[in-house]
Amino acid sequence: MAENRGGHGPGARGGYQKPKDAKRTMLRLMKYISGRKWLLVIVFLCVIASSIASIAGTYLIRPVLNELVGAGTLSDKLGYLAKMLAVMAAVFLFGAVCTYAQSAIMAQLAHRGTNKLRGELFDKMQDLPLSFYDKHPHGELMSRFSNDADYVQQMLEQSIVSVISSSLLFVGIVVVMLFTCAPLFLVTLLVLFGSFFAIRIVGGRSRKLYRQQQKALGEMNGNIQEMIEGLRVVKAFTHEDAAKAQFGELNDAYFDVAKDANFYGTAMMPIVANVMNIGYALTSIVGGLFAFGGMLDLGGLAVYLQYGRQISQPMSQVSQQMTSILSALAGAERIFEIIDMEPEVDEGVVTLVGAHKDANGAITEDRESVHPHTWAWKVPRSSRLTLVPVAIEPDGSPIELGQAVREGGALRMLAPNVDSPDGIWVRAERDGSLTEVKDLAALASHGWAWKYPDSAGESTLHIVRGSVRNVPGEDYCLTELKGAVRLIDVCFSYVPEKPILKHVSVYANPGQKIAFVGSTGAGKTTITNLINRFYEIDSGMITYDGIDVRDIRKDDLRRSLGAVLQDTHLFTGTVMDNIRYGRLNATDEECIAAAKSANAHSFIRRLPDGYNTVVSGDGANLSQGQRQLLAIARAAVADPPVMVLDEATSSIDTRTERHIERGMDALMEGRTVFVIAHRLSTVRNSNCIVVIEHGEIQEKGDHEDLLKQKGRYYKLYTGQNILD
């Protein structure tokens, strides 16, 4: 079901969620527009000037009326009137210019500030772990960029200035009214209390109904989205009538609450206007009596009545804008909640670098090639890893070699990378003793391994495959990237005390194909997510070419891995752009070569504009099979040594399936491959098939071995059980 978007989805603006710390959030938001403080000073001066101009322009009516009704010739009165009209026009024009200036400047500052805010939000979301997205619906996250950011922009652009301007105008009008006739202001004060009471009662009911309207609209929009996305299923099960009935109920519920909300919303202004009209009449009567009694001149009465009509406007504007401000501050808090989150932790120090390998197998770092053919792990000597020479036993286990010196008849092993002319080569046996090695060349097999300390003070050795550069004096060493991946007693849980994987151990040598088979939810995809370090394991170890993946920088680790997922996601852009997404610096020729190897070139050529055909939202104008072929081409252009292939469960025609299988075969050639299998026919040629259920490995072996065991795999293969 679609998530309920009632809280943040598109809807009426009348309801709002109160911010938790309005003052702190407002001060933080102001930093986004305070980069050019002199512009804020100009805005503030313009607000003051426009408020004064509005008050002064109205007050000029008083001397004009008093002059017109006083003694003097008609020509003198007309001359004075013309002069004062020119002054009034200049005052109001000045106020209009100041209002325009403040609006234009605040619009620029608000757009700039919101742009920066959205940028920080997007950047932070790129740095958050996948576990964050597991806990937050996509619609909720999208509302941060749309609704919440829009509310913040409107507040910065209009609401704050409007509240300041209205407050200044209100205070200015009150001061002038008191100056004009203080006793008459008591009547005005009574009217203001009446207006405030009406706004509070009607406005409170209106806000409550608008919140209900927003929730009802969110539920209705969620239903519409769900029905559009699942229209094929609705039609397949002939549930059109049920869908219509369900939407009708939601639509009617929205209509009922919207009707009441609009009634109270539209009733606000007439009620306040009637209260003010009654007050205006009462003020006119009392003011007239004051004028007849000589307490107030005619011009003063006219000005006072005009201010009496104007005083309700700033009150109403402040009330309306405070709702917008509180909505914006609540939205800003939701944005800052994400911005303040801790980014994905990465304590890795090992980096992936291009390398050059000479005829003798020696490697050096290649800093010139854009896309080198050989890659290596660059390991700082300051890390916890230590590269040591080893002898490899017949069972494949490593035994540390090193140089030692005799001290008092006993051997003491020197630190790794310490070359002593008097040193004696020895083996560090498992019982801790040292055995002298007379002739290194006589060892059946020897090489290098990474030495890892463990929590018990012991150490473990992980064999390095491929060439090694270990030059004393250099602050780093290089080991060739080969694609050997090992999961060693791995345990993992998304939620504490609810294990997903239990003591899983899987070994993949370079170039091997490892297939995971099991029911939905068994933990197959979780294993591949752990190899990518999308999540961190609870215990155990995952090594890549003998290096703990936790010691490899995540960006470098993921650059060395490729993935073709069952839910193929394509981005808006051309076919060429989507292939190049695998490696952004790939040339057109490299992208076309990747498409050919993925068996996608033939269908791409038949598209209206070939490789320049624009892919619509998530590849809706392509078939499922075509999207998969593009995903394979995208992985091929990245050319990683290790691949993760999650087979699609969608039904595709036999011909397209053969195209995809050939593309997959070409992509897997010469790489270490992890396959999440949904069709057993595709895993028969795997070096190892791992049957996993409930997070535990039940069986492990090649196709023939597992058939002989006649266990879970045998039942799946012979059709006695269903895979998914």
Go through the PLM ranges and name each one.
Residues 71-72, 77, 176-190, 260-333, ...:
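Helix-loop-helix
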Residues 40-98, 178-183, 294-298:
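Transmembrane helix-loop-helix hairpins at lipid-water interfaces of multipass membrane proteins
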Residues 130-131, 147-156, 160, 164, ...:
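An intracellular "coupling" helix at the cytosolic face of ABC transporter transmembrane type-1 domains
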Residues 2, 104-123, 137, 164-165, ...:
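Cytoplasmic coupling helices
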Residues 347-348, 355-724:
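ABC-type nucleotide-binding domain
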Residues 35, 39-49, 94, 158-212, ...:
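Transmembrane helices of ABC transporter permease
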Residues 4, 27-30, 38-63, 84, ...:
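Alpha-helical segments in transporter systems
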Residues 14-22, 45-46, 53-69, 91-138, ...:
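Juxtamembrane helix-loop junctions of ABC transporter transmembrane domains
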